[in-house]
């Protein structure tokens, strides 16, 4: 079902797909089983060095830790600045997606990525573990680190670009659209 305009491909037999939500939950469960204390809904307000590591302050209290991993995504620069002089600033990139109905799932059997551009990793058409297709993302710099809304222009770009790879996609079989931010 690939476009006849496709001239070459890179076959990566080790590539795979996962359910990203279940994968993230499994990683959190594994971390807890190995002694990690999750402090959910606890924004970090200060970080200080201590003889044993670090003290992380939140509205819910202070937490002592030997190690602190800054996994704050697009807010990682703000968390970094709580401990060190600001050294960088993150401008998030919004990526918009289509989640297609299972009726479109047979269009591709592998992850189809286009070549990346200067602005992003490229638009993909990929099967999901549930038999659907996921299509996207675009890459649009946004100033607001909470802006995960979709736009008509962004989704039109994703649709047009994906059709260059898989021209038989029926975007009327779209279940939902969503967006995320990348650092």
Regions found by a protein language model. Name each.
Residues 58-67:
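Core beta-strand elements of the Rossmann-like FAD/NAD(P) dinucleotide-binding domain
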Residues 1-40, 45-52, 57, 169-170, ...:
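Flavin (FAD/FMN) cofactor-binding and adjacent substrate-gating region
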Residues 53, 62-63, 72-183:
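Active-site substrate-recognition segment that forms the wall
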Residues 8-9, 67, 132-133:
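Structural motif
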